[in-house]
Amino acid sequence: KVEAQLKVVNEGGSISTDTSGATPAISVSDADAVTLIFACGTDYKMELPNFRGEDPHDAVTERIKAASKKGYETLKADHVADHSALFSRMELGFDEEIPQIPTDELIQKYRNMVENNGGEVPTTAEQRALEVICYQFGRYLTIAGSREGALPTNLQGVWGEGNFAWGGDYHFNINVQMNYWPTLASNLAECQTAYNDYLNVLKKAGRYAAAAAFGIKSNEGEENGWLVGCFSTPYMFSALGQKNNAAGWNPIGSAWALLNAYEYYLYTEDTDYLKNELYPSLKEVANFWNEALYWSEYQQRYVSAPSYSPENGPIVNGASYDQQFIWQHFENTIQAAETLGVDADLVAEWKEKQSKLDPVLVGDDGQVKEWYEETHFGKAQAGDLGEIDIPQWRQSLGAQSGGVQPPHRHLSHLMALYPCNMISKDNPEFMDAAIVSLNERGLDATGWSKAHKLNLWARTGHSKEAFQIVQSAVGGGNSGFLTNLLSSHGGGENYKGYPIFQIDGNFGYTAGVNEMLLQSQ
């Protein structure tokens, strides 16, 4: 149930209402000033099993009354103080002057430069200013959209009218995690509380998914494993799979989700949170994979099966995407257990499994392999069988250009480089292979994918490619930032046909600039 109330406060003049029509109307005449006070609420409560709290009427009514007593100036001062306490914690600048032109015009000038279309282009100072504005806009969206006691941010908003994009869901195969990539390094740790709290409820529903998909059950009082597939909702949908789309199979979702949560601990060093909330979840998912991993005689390693590399190629055993996140999850859980001084017997089991995952494999083109059977780009060979084209390789529905599929927007086989940390400059063989794979994927993409590529290239230390993606994102139009600064997924041919707002591109850009300037692994 949703309730909204609007109060109109006039200074001078007169006010009247008309309820005779289909839509009630409020009219103000000859006023010196008008203040609109709006409040809304729902009876949603983030609590299993029915997610139903109290009727919102009393709370919304009280909020309107309290705001009315404060008045406009006090309300504004409260808002500025609340926002500034978070936003003003850090500054980023390159001695650029703030341009005195509207942002949409500045974006258009920058786009002219990127597209080389002959239009007016920005000065160097204007370029730096806009790049910083886009960075700080990601922090602004974090502050505005993710606060304690609320739901975490998602793709486009949770509560929408009609059949809006992605149904207002949470995508756990990169998107919701990307939303929180910049939060901690941008000194906004409090803004991740909503995400952490959501995971604490999601895991309870996720035990049903683990039982249904893998037969690993948690009876009353047991915590034997929890999963979330590609999609979730405010009502903790966690099932794996999607009709006619392999992308729904994402058993690694919970391990990836907890990577953000573990980084929250690393930044805050909140040992109470680690001990009482996070470690039980880490341990539960580690125990799940300790049981669910399958020893493949053919591959001579433990593998996740069945396995899928979002959103590219066929269903396989041991896709690099799964293997890398399982390795990282074991690593984080082992570190957490050793920090707390607990579960030494389990740590030994986890280390044994982790040592036999072999999560990064190098192919014949020098690339990080996306699948075990991959040989060259787009080719695969299993055992003594002949080499074949990889089924559904580069399948990007709606992105064809002249009948040719562009490089795929997902880079699921490079998670060990970012957001994980198995690939680093300390391992040049793997780093070189990651660079080969990055070059194959190219610099162009849709908005959120550019953001991921920005973080990946930043991790390699290749400033030229990283900055090219900064420019491609800021000046990317329908496959980058729109003139209102919101990031676009981009629909139609080559992701440039028409805009689809998708907020993770904003957050990923901010995270990428963080990585370009300062890295903590």
Tell me what each language-model feature is.
Residues 1-170, 189-211, 341, 400:
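Acidic/polar, glycine-enriched structural segments that form the non-catalytic walls/loops
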Residues 172-175, 184-208, 221, 246-267, ...:
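Active-site core of glycosidic bond-cleaving carbohydrate-active enzymes
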Residues 140-151, 165-172, 191, 204-210, ...:
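Secretory-pathway/luminal and periplasmic proteins that interact with or process carbohydrate-rich
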Residues 46-49, 53-57, 154-169, 222-275, ...:
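The feature captures the catalytic groove of carbohydrate-active enzymes
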Residues 95-113, 149-157, 220-239, 254-261, ...:
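Active-site-adjacent bridging/hinge elements
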Residues 20, 122, 161-166, 173-180, ...:
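Flexible glycine/proline-enriched surface loops and loop-helix/loop-strand junctions
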Residues 37, 133-134, 141-143, 180-182, ...:
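Structural recognition of the beta-strand scaffold that forms the well-ordered cores
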Residues 131-145, 254-263, 279-289:
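Extended, hydrophobic/aromatic-rich amphipathic alpha-helical segments that build helical scaffolds
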